[in-house]
Amino acid sequence: MARKNKDGVKYIALKKADLERRFKEYNEMYFDGVLPPCNIRIVKSTNRIAAWYNFRSKVPKIYMARNVYWTEDDLKSVFIHEMVHHYVWKILKYDSFFSHVRTFRKVCRMLRKKHGLRVNLWEYPLSHWKGEKKPSFLKDMTVRFLYWILPL
């Protein structure tokens, strides 16, 4: 469902059913239907990460921040980015502490060549966070680092 933010930009209110539909659609369209199921969670991000993939649980999870004004293009790009993580982890069986390594980039290049998709390696430059000021760079990077080294 499209709404407009205070700047008049159309955005999408995240719904789990819509994200699950997108997962199935993008899986068929871009990954030839090979991705196994993945839990999708809509959460409030407190560290300015718009989305992330958690491979540490039995059934991996994709988390999407609800406190973002998601445009259609941003949502598609970021969601497919997280699906690439799922592909690398579950299909290619690549197990690494570092998430945006050569294998990840190789899959992104394949998607660009085959489908014309541009998947950014790092957080998509989202400018529409809902009523929050941006934390300092040091705080932001510290939170990201701790997320990777601490067990969940």
Residue ranges with predicted function:
Residues 77-90:
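Active-site recognition of the HExxH zinc-binding catalytic motif
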Residues 2-73, 90-152:
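Metalloprotease/metallohydrolase-associated module, dominated by Zn2+-dependent proteases
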